[in-house]
Amino acid sequence: MPSLTPKTQDNSIRENVYRVIKENIAALQLAPGTTVSTQELAAKLQVSRTPVREAFIRLQKEDLVEITPQKGTMVSRIDLTRAEKERFIRESLETAILPLFLQNCTEPDLKELELLIEKQKACFTGLKPLEFIALDNQFHQRFFELAGQDLSWDVVASTNPHYNRLRVLTVQNAATFDGAVRQHEVMMDQIRHRDIDALRRELTDHVRKIIAEKNVLLQLYPDYFATAQQEMKL
């Protein structure tokens, strides 16, 4: 876990502690089901325990940690039912903005998106799944920005703690990693041809694919999930 640069303002310290812990949970550096110590995190981050406790309270509201009196704080396990609901939000918003995105997308924008895909390929070659996730986010975020729907992206980015951790798990697998890059290449061809129907279908499949692979993930990482029985509900 990275350390924090000391700040002069208490609010800056609080925000940085919250951000670092949240990023480590999202990246599975703090694995689902892991018990986390306020004292140990405070020491690692070189801060007092107060901002760590405050961060835990905020993260509990986001369903990323569970705080149990007398027992401590645990990183929330991945809830597949919640992940499916988060997927629905993303799919609904992202498919809705496609007409505006295609309308506003220019040749320089296309070049920018293609460059992001090239960087994603480099991540695949270098086996850097977390860097790929960041580039994947940038790729899809540009859809929203070019559509003039930045707020919708903020909604997607702030309401996907369980779905996002599924994404991180899926790209640990080389075949899935490569498949995600190839889907982006297909999307780019559809964007260039302004084929909105094909793009909508491909994007829908792209977003749902992670949920579709839940059974494999349950077998590989059973301790990361709230209950192994949840796959029967989806």
Which residue ranges define each predicted feature?
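Short linear motifs at protein or domain termini
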Residues: 1-103, 211-234
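Short helix-capping and inter-helix turn/linker motifs at the boundaries of alpha-helical repeat units
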Residues: 12, 110-111, 175-178
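Short, flexible turn/loop "capping" segments at secondary-structure junctions
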Residues: 66-68, 136, 179-181
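Short alpha-helical transmembrane interface motifs in multi-pass membrane proteins
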Residues: 79-80, 166-170
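C-terminal regulatory/effector modules of DNA-binding transcriptional regulators
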Residues: 176-234
